[in-house]
Amino acid sequence: MIVMFPYLPISSEDEKEMLKTIGKNSIEELFEVIPKEVRLNRPLNLGKPMSELEVRKRLGSYADENKNLSQLVSFLGAGVYDHYIPSVVKHIISRSEFYTAYTPYQPEISQGTLQAIFEYQTMITNLTGMEVTNASMYDGASACAEAAMMACDATKRKSIIVSKTVNPETRKVLKTYMHFKEVEVVEIEDADGVTDIEKLKEVIGPNTAAVIVQYPNFFGIIENLQEIEKITHEQKAMLITYVHPIPLGILKSPGEIGADIAVGDGQSLGNGLHYGGPYLGFLATTQKLLRRMPGRIVGQTKDVDGKRGFVLTLQAREQHIRREKATSNICSNHSLNALTAAVYLATIGKKGIKEVAYQCLQKAHYAYTVLTESGKYKPAFNKPFFMEFALKTDKDVAEINKKLLEEGILGGYDLQRDYEKYKNVMLLAFTEKRTKEEIDRLKSLLEVM
């Protein structure tokens, strides 16, 4: 018997032992079931072996070709935002007991993790104005799709209405989920950048399980949710709001407006951009829908000595208890990202999130004024906005962004990528990190393009 060392790369002796175990004489014999015409008939072009030092240098040279936001000024948003993250956030989440912790199935040894998630749930509940929150979802898009399934389950209806002012990527994920649930997805066009209310009145009906709108919407505009809520509930459908958490520091919460479910992406709550993820989705709802919620829920209880403790609760909803009747088949969550959000919210506090929201609002409106004053760039929509707005130009947005990148600036999102009717329209985002000098420089560069 050959002694195999799992921490060493595979040796020829290891290879022989494995082939012998499965009854094969060679690698060629192992792969003979694969047609020769689709098999690589040459060695992989990996180059010569390298030492650790050489590998680090090679990979470092590749990494140097990238640019990060310590080198660039970002006016790009469209769902992911360059907010400031206090250094204490990363310091706390990097502690090994949080960073490497697994699912806290054993509460007696997981009280720290469970309490942290419980605090996260409490803060998201307060922020959204809802009654209950789960321990997190994969991202905002999956949270939205899970909310739609909740609505279908609760109403026993098979149609979801979603506004086209909802993030296009979120709508794609929604359609994928609903396709396999055999649920109809009806998209409503926008009218001047907001949900077309008259069209909503036409398409909503007795088979509508829910109406999904974004707040503020993908174009940065604040939708008239009061009117949408009235139309939705008149048909006994549910209102699902896809929300950006930072504006909730000063805007009315989904709970105050009358939403049944509030979902969103928690990237803005202390999570970096990370080349697209991982982020976290949050899902908050009413007490009435508690037992229909997907994912994990941490609850507060007392132990045999009467001391406060935390446990995973209402687990009969989950697939590891009863797969066929589970509220969803989500089998994990993003607890580390949720912890990040909790640390961020605890660090900045109620006044802090209001301050962040106000700075985003004020800087966006200052930028709107200076970027449109010459008339070269015109507003795409005439509606109230929060921290993002769209500008019309007579030039190709991709070409503008290419020139801005040469000047160390990440330009706006090209809306034509998702909306054919919005050719040469750029969506710009402004967070609390942007300065007057950076905005003025953006104006100067755009004016000469």
UniProtKB/Swiss-Prot annotation:
InterPro entries: GcvPA, GDC-P_N, GDC_P, PyrdxlP-dep_Trfase, PyrdxlP-dep_Trfase_major, PyrdxlP-dep_Trfase_small. It catalyses: N(6)-[(R)-lipoyl]-L-lysyl-[glycine-cleavage complex H protein] + glycine + H(+) = N(6)-[(R)-S(8)-aminomethyldihydrolipoyl]-L-lysyl-[glycine-cleavage complex H protein] + CO2. The keyword Oxidoreductase applies. The keyword Oxidoreductase applies. CDD domains: GDC-P (cd00613). It holds the Pfam family GDC-P. PANTHER family: GLYCINE CLEAVAGE SYSTEM P-PROTEIN, GLYCINE DEHYDROGENASE (DECARBOXYLATING). HAMAP family: GcvPA (MF_00712). This is Probable glycine dehydrogenase (decarboxylating) subunit 1.
